[in-house]
UniProtKB/Swiss-Prot annotation:
The gene is rimO. Binds 2 [4Fe-4S] clusters. One cluster is coordinated with 3 cysteines and an exchangeable S-adenosyl-L-methionine. Coiled coil: none annotated. Gene3D superfamilies: Methylthiotransferase, N-terminal domain, Nucleic acid-binding proteins, tm_1862 like domain. It catalyses: L-aspartate(89)-[ribosomal protein uS12]-hydrogen + (sulfur carrier)-SH + AH2 + 2 S-adenosyl-L-methionine = 3-methylsulfanyl-L-aspartate(89)-[ribosomal protein uS12]-hydrogen + (sulfur carrier)-H + 5'-deoxyadenosine + L-methionine + A + S-adenosyl-L-homocysteine + 2 H(+). This is Ribosomal protein uS12 methylthiotransferase RimO. CDD domains: Radical_SAM. Residues 4-120 form the MTTase N-terminal domain. PANTHER family: RIBOSOMAL PROTEIN S12 METHYLTHIOTRANSFERASE RIMO, RIBOSOMAL PROTEIN US12 METHYLTHIOTRANSFERASE RIMO. Belongs to the methylthiotransferase family. RimO subfamily. It comes from Fervidobacterium nodosum (strain ATCC 35602 / DSM 5306 / Rt17-B1). Residues 368-431 form the TRAM domain. Its EC number is 2.8.4.4.
Length: 431
């Protein structure tokens, strides 16, 4: 087998980033080289997203962009993997024959072993990996995938159809990976899965996220543990107790998708408006410093003006610290595709604009309360004498930043906040 210099592109979610940190390790173990510039590469590996229309289009555009390189460099290899391939295994090879290898959702080691082989298309059922090693960026945080697949039945979502059922990794293997990361200088461990609250149920017969948090918390070192993607229907009292450990940041990422009982029912969600409100009240009662993040879909089939107004009232009542908003994507193989009373794109976009305007007001006011306070910041980047970081209140890539004059990254520092806008903070080092 010829060894290749490969340029790697990761599209989509943090779970893909976690997978490809391991994939790059296995590529190197096999003798391939991962390069930072496509001009130096013999080929490209593209990890795709197949979740919604915009993500699919981005993936296809990226594939076509790199396939066009073959016009000038006929020997340039193009390998495509990930959720888009798993979702459309027959259509893609027919539509884009320039691609040298199509690989579905397979473990990182298997994927690395498949590169530069003669097989045109490979797909396996979803499988989790055992940790052997990983190659990460110089950033001080790392994503660790604790499970894959999903057993939920949200009507707008197609992920279970191409990712398979929920499969957890073993406690010991996750702990081994986290120890490796901490020993190699990481300051923040971000736990990800389709639904982190479901971790362990398939392996151990019960939710094991609290036990996992305890084990990671017991690892020596000064670092944060952040939990992402918690399904609101399964945030139990035991799960909430797991956040009491010292290194677990009090950051609760709980995508509710909507708050109207009518829309929640159509979405296949089980918690009611009242139960959601009680959940967030409980979290803030247990952890006064809690930061609440959620995701919202507007324009879902059947969403009336009253449903949307109820949603806005709910957002104003809860005052989420962080919120991501999206227009409903009408996926052809999702159950919601067959629902009546579709909302026009124009109306949905207008509702999204309104939602984000309301959230901007809330975010600004909540950030203003931080002015004059001293907070811990993890510094990640330095630009022209300004160091840029995040507090525990902000997750990587999706939330805001803290800007401070100074030097030195990949470290914690205490910062007194001097200015605050809607999403970002400015401050000065106090130690």
């Amino acid at each position: 087998m010829a060894f290749l210099k490969l340029y790697v592109i990761v599209l989509g979610c943090a779970k893909n980033e976690a997978d490809f940190s391991l994939f790059k390790y296995h590529l190197k173990q096999l003798g391939h080289e991962v390069v930072d510039d496509v001009e130096d590469a013999d080929g490209v590996v593209i990890d795709t997203c197949g979740f919604i229309v915009d993500a699919k289009q981005e993936s296809i555009d990226t594939i076509l962009e790199f396939a066009s390189i073959k016009k000038q460099k006929p020997d340039f290899k193009v390998y495509v993997t990930g959720c888009l391939v798993q979702r459309y295994p027959k259509d893609l090879p027919l539509e884009i024959p320039e691609v040298d290898g199509w690989f579905g959702v397979i473990p990182p080691k298997n994927l690395a072993e498949s590169i530069n082989k003669t097989k045109k298309y490979i797909t396996d059922p979803v499988a989790v990996y055992e940790f052997e090693g990983r190659v990460d960026s110089d950033l001080p945080y790392a994503y660790v995938k604790i499970a894959d697949g999903c057993d939920r039945a949200c009507t707008f979502c197609t992920i279970p159809k191409f990712k398979g059922g929920f499969v957890s990794r073993k406690l010991e293997d996750i702990e081994k990976e986290v120890r490796y990361l901490i020993e190699n200088g990481k300051k923040e461990i971000v736990l990800v899965a389709q639904d982190t609250t479901g971790y362990g149920v398939d392996l151990y017969g019960k939710q094991m996220l609290p036990e996992l948090l305890k084990r990671i918390n017991d690892i020596d070192g000064n670092f944060w543990i952040r939990v992402m993607y918690m399904h609101p229907d399964h945030v139990t009292d035991e799960i909430l107790k797991g956040f009491s450990y010292e290194k677990v940041v009090k950051y609760f990422d709980i995508p509710i998708q909507h708050s109207s009982d009518n829309i929640l029912k159509l979405m296949g969600r089980t918690k009611s408006t009242k139960e959601l409100e009680e959940l967030f009240d409980k979290i803030r009662s247990l952890y006064p410093q809690a930061v609440l993040r959620t995701s919202i879909i507007v324009g879902f089939p059947g969403e009336t003006k009253d449903d949307f107004e109820q949603l806005i009232d709910f957002i104003r009542t809860i005052e989420f610290d962080r919120l991501g908003g999206f227009v409903y994507s009408d996926e052809e193989d999702a159950a919601s595709y067959n629902l009546p009373n579709k909302v026009s794109l124009k109306t949905a976009q207008k509702r999204l604009d309104t939602l984000m305007e309301v959230q901007a007001e809330i975010s600004f006011l909540r950030n203003q309360r931080l002015v004059g306070k001293v907070i811990d910041v993890l510094f990640e980047e330095e630009v022209n004498g300004v160091i840029i970081g995040r507090s525990y209140m902000d997750a990587p890539e999706v939330d805001g930043n803290v800007f401070v004059k100074g030097h030195g990254i990949n470290r914690f520092g205490k910062v007194k906040i001097t200015e605050a806008d809607t999403y970002d903070l400015e401050g000065e080092l106090v130690e």
